[in-house]
Amino acid sequence: MTDDVRDVNTETTDATEVAEIDSAAGEAGDSATEAFDTDSATESTAQKGQRHRDLWRMQVTLKPVPVILILLMLISGGATGWLYLEQYRPDQQTDSGAARAAVAAASDGTIALLSYSPDTLDQDFATARSHLAGDFLSYYDQFTQQIVAPAAKQKSLKTTAKVVRAAVSELHPDSAVVLVFVDQSTTSKDSPNPSMAASSVMVTLAKVDGNWLITKFTPV
């Protein structure tokens, strides 16, 4: 009987020890789980913080981009505006009246330059000079005195020019280019019958004291 009681007590003690071990193991597991959860929470918080900082950096990096684009657009717009004012606006600041005045000056000047008679050379040259300015005026004086006048007197050359058409090629407040189409008849002592010639001239003008004057005369 005593041995049986001893065995029962022994088994009870063993069972109690097993239960205590299981309980301790369970508590250890719970503690480990709680520690893991805490670590996970800490890691999750750290990751969120890191993502927040990364996102903030991206925002800081990306925010200047629209500003740069705006600045580039403003610069581009300013450059476009400058080009418009520099190249195109002056044409628009001149009205149709200015264009007609430039065409008239180019036409009258062309007729004066290409028309002369041996009997009225001085008057013809003076009329032509009144339409000229700048270096071209100096060139015309030299050319007529050295070339045109001697030939006109010697051969009795007489030329008469008529403008057929004229149109503005470029127009600015203080300068213009006009394309002029001319018919010219010429007679001489050796050829009394008029010979006709058609030509075109690019006439460059400058506004001097409010008047359009020819500064270049280029056959084309």
UniProtKB/Swiss-Prot annotation:
Domain of life: Bacteria
Family according to the record: To M.tuberculosis Rv1363c.
Compositionally biased intervals (Polar residues): 39-48
Keyword Membrane applies: yes
Protein name as it appears in the record: Uncharacterized protein MT1407
Region (Disordered): 1-50
Residue ranges of the TM segments: 65-85
GO cellular component: membrane
Topology term for the membrane: Single-pass membrane protein
Subcellular location as annotated: Membrane
Annotated keywords: Membrane, Transmembrane, Transmembrane helix
